[in-house]
């Protein structure tokens, strides 16, 4: 492994498995080629049946092993290499001579953690060891083992491990059963019986969308009547894995059953609407550029709220309205028609009262007055109401100054995107030059930006501020692609692929 790793010029994406590879593993491998827009990666698949994650009465000895078939499937799916280390290679001197990692109790108090004591301690201990040996840039895991994925994300974050974690949606066979190495234990009749697991979970998810409460006892009874032995069926917070009783933006409905001697797990996510992303930050931080690209990458609707305020500012100038006079400004808001729609170029066309103002709203004249206009309560009330109507079904990303605090306070992901005044002045100069406008001195631009920050953060109505639950992202020194990739990583921590698939994957 050391020699192979030393000769890799590109980044390494690591897919750890216990072998007995199937379609689900194949999809993990293939998905690597759809990550981001950076240079191609080497894909390493490991096959290691981890003795630390099996209990005394579990199937370690009988777990299916077929290395030749695994090599064939991995190669066919696009893997660069397959590594099948022995226990001695992973734990020189024996596992007992190495440190063990203990998962925090709250992360394994429910679901599989409760019924398989010590299982996740064994998982994280081995994964940490494999990461140390492989040193990958990206760790690729399936969402099928959701509790495991959540725990490993906590491991990476809390230990500061230098690896990104990518989760891939559960892959299902044509009949709906989630792909699993243990499915091969099932006889034909048992497989038909096992289909009740995904079918009833899917039905519960549909009923939840219609506003009906999930009946955990009813699910258990239904499976038992069909001959399945229910180990657990629980509704938990999708991220802290604690039981839920009241409604929440996203929760996990998960179950484990036995069909004969075969243990099967499955889950579904319950969500009242599609996800919303709120990106706030000061002027010139690059919000529009990265948010537009981020939305396109994930297939989300891009809601440029800043353009809406700029359009109203442009309208005040066309009507010779004093931007400081809220009464006068309010008069032009009557019968306001504001449209945001994608154009063929991929940018967003902005129309106000039938006028295409896409370019006009980026002029220095509009920029110098937009903070004044946006500070009026009548303007913010009118536009916030429009924005919230656009977001009632979710499936969008919005950027502005108060998206996470006032417009969409229940957004799944909130990011405060910022940069130093000097960096923002440099970007503003480039933008003005590209648009054909005169470019002031950088020091003057920096002063203007600092004054804009002061005005935005001290206004009485919806001041610029970071939401308490927002993640701050300082973009100094980062390329646009790096910012987008960071946003995608943050999104995926909060929104599974199964809930909102990455566009084109």
Swiss-Prot record:
Stretches for region Pantoate--beta-alanine ligase: 1-268
Gene3D superfamilies: HUPs (3.40.50.620), P-loop containing nucleotide triphosphate hydrolases (3.40.50.300), Pantoate-beta-alanine ligase, C-terminal domain (3.30.1300.10)
Reaction(s) this enzyme catalyzes, per UniProt: (R)-pantoate + beta-alanine + ATP = (R)-pantothenate + AMP + diphosphate + H(+); CMP + ATP = CDP + ADP; dCMP + ATP = dCDP + ADP
Principal localisation: cytoplasm
Cross-referenced InterPro entries: Cytidylate_kin, Cytidylate_kinase_dom, P-loop_NTPase, Pantoate_ligase, Pantoate_ligase/cytidylate_kin, Pantoate_ligase_C, Rossmann-like_a/b/a_fold
Ranges where the record places region Cytidylate kinase: 269-505
One of the GO biological process terms: pyrimidine nucleotide metabolic process
Subcellular location: Cytoplasm
UniProt name for this protein: Bifunctional pantoate ligase/cytidylate kinase
Designated gene of the protein: panC/cmk
């Amino acid at each position: 492994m050391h020699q192979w790793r030393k000769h890799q010029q590109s980044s390494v994406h690591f897919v750890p498995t216990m072998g007995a590879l199937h379609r689900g593993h194949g999809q993990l491998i293939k998905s690597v080629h759809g990550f981001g827009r950076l240079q191609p990666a080497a894909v390493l698949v490991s096959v290691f049946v981890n003795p630390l994650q099996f209990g005394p009465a579990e199937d370690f000895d009988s777990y299916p092993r077929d290395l030749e078939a695994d090599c064939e499937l991995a190669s066919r799916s696009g893997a660069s290499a397959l590594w099948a280390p022995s226990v001695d290679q992973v734990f020189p001197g024996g596992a007992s001579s190495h440190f063990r990692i203990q998962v925090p109790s709250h992360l394994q108090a429910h679901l599989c953690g409760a019924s398989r004591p010590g299982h996740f301690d064994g998982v994280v201990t081995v994964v940490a060891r494999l990461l140390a040996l492989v040193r990958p840039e990206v760790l690729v895991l399936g969402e099928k083992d959701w509790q495991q994925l959540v725990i490993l994300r906590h491991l990476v974050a809390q230990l500061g491990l230098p690896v990104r974690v990518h989760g891939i949606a559960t892959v299902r066979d044509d009949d709906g059963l989630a792909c699993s190495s243990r499915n091969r234990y099932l006889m034909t009749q048992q497989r038909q019986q096992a289909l009740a697991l995904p079918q009833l979970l899917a039905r519960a998810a549909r009923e939840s969308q219609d506003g009906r409460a999930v009946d955990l006892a009813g699910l258990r009874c239904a499976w038992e009547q069909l001959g399945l032995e229910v180990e657990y069926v629980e509704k938990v917070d999708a991220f802290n894995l604690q039981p839920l009783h009241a409604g929440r933006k996203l929760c996990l409905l998960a179950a484990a059953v036995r069909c004969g001697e075969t243990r099967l797990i499955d889950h579904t996510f319950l969500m009242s609407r599609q996800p919303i992303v709120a990106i706030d930050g000061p002027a010139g931080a690059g919000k529009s550029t990265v948010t537009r690209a981020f939305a396109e990458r994930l297939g989300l609707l891009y809601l440029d709220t800043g353009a809406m305020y700029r359009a109203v500012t442009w309208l005040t100038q066309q009507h010779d309205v004093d931007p400081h006079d809220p009464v006068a400004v309010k008069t032009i808001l009557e019968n306001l028609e504001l449209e945001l729609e994608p154009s063929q170029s991929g940018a967003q066309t902005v129309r106000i009262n039938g006028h295409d103002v896409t370019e006009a709203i980026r002029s220095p004249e509009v920029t110098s007055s937009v903070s004044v206009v946006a500070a009026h309560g009548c303007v913010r009330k009118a536009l916030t109401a429009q924005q919230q109507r656009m977001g009632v079904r979710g499936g969008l990303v919005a950027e502005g100054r108060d998206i996470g605090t006032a417009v969409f306070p229940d957004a799944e992901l909130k990011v405060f995107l910022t940069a130093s005044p000097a960096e923002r002045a440099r970007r503003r100069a480039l933008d003005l030059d590209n648009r054909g406008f005169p470019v002031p001195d950088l020091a003057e631009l920096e002063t203007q930006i600092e004054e804009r920050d002061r005005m935005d953060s001290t206004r009485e109505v919806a001041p610029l501020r970071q939401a308490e639950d927002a993640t701050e992202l300082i973009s100094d020194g980062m390329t646009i692609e790096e910012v987008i990739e960071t946003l995608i990583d943050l999104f995926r921590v909060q929104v599974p692929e199964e809930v909102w698939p990455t566009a084109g994957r």
